[in-house]
């Protein structure tokens, strides 16, 4: 049996209203604290209710509007090095990843690019500031992962991570009320990203009985939440649990070919990562339905027996139908082009990650052409 390591937060608060724990956490151990957030949260009602108590506890605020670049992280480090001893992140996956990267690199001497996977030349240490992660979306699971994703679409054309076990946030606060009011597209894009994490981790060659059980639990939460994301408090609670479990399982078991492709497209095009994954998921399910790989067939049979035993169609085609029929936003219908040159670059750089099959370039091309319009 494959051995896995699961690393989680020291503290994880969960439930409606749990953001009320933030002020007591900060006042219990006063330290110079920097907030990373996004305009949608800072302009919202929850922040308004916290601002009078929170603002005096902060040195300042950095606003994140997209996936952070190495240059932006270096600028934050230069501005705050030696002044900050704790970080709070309130926002979506891009905000949390930016804060995780800053918390680590403010404790390292070299520029961000030197430590990044794929292109860096220096091993990153585990030095990092304590981080309180509070997601306002449910997709990346960044509040419990060991990596921070950094995207440079301008200079190095790379999307890669900083990674160390110590980069799991010290504390996570999972408050489903923070998802309320999110646009349907954001809810759907993030939720399908959470599903993709869970599904790829379930099918990973490095998964084991424990990680697969967590994946199945997360997928069950996703199936419950998906049709009702914009109309049910219970659905928001379920998708937040799915996202968290997706973060745990991807960290323990790894991801597959969908993310092996999505990361390379993300380095070339500023498309929402969750939408990219969702669009690649559908042709991947078609490919998977035709697979004769014994372990894939056994795992899909178990998934179907556990989660939708009354269905008699192939589990892959059931999932395609369920996802597309019940989506609150049609993530697969927008016109998202990539050029022929970008297709060639993506095929050259992408890989199957921890998939049970090493997918060939023609198979990966089939997925990409099924997900995007080639210009």
Regions found by a protein language model. Give the residues of each.
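Flexible, glycine/charged-enriched surface loops at secondary-structure junctions
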Residues: 205-214, 229-238, 253-258, 294-295, ...
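C-terminal charged capping/lid subdomain of soluble metabolic enzymes
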Residues: 166, 302-375
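Carboxylate- and glycine-rich phosphate/diphosphate-binding segment that chelates Mg2+/Mn2+
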Residues: 147-253
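ATP/NTP phosphate-donor binding region
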Residues: 1-86, 330
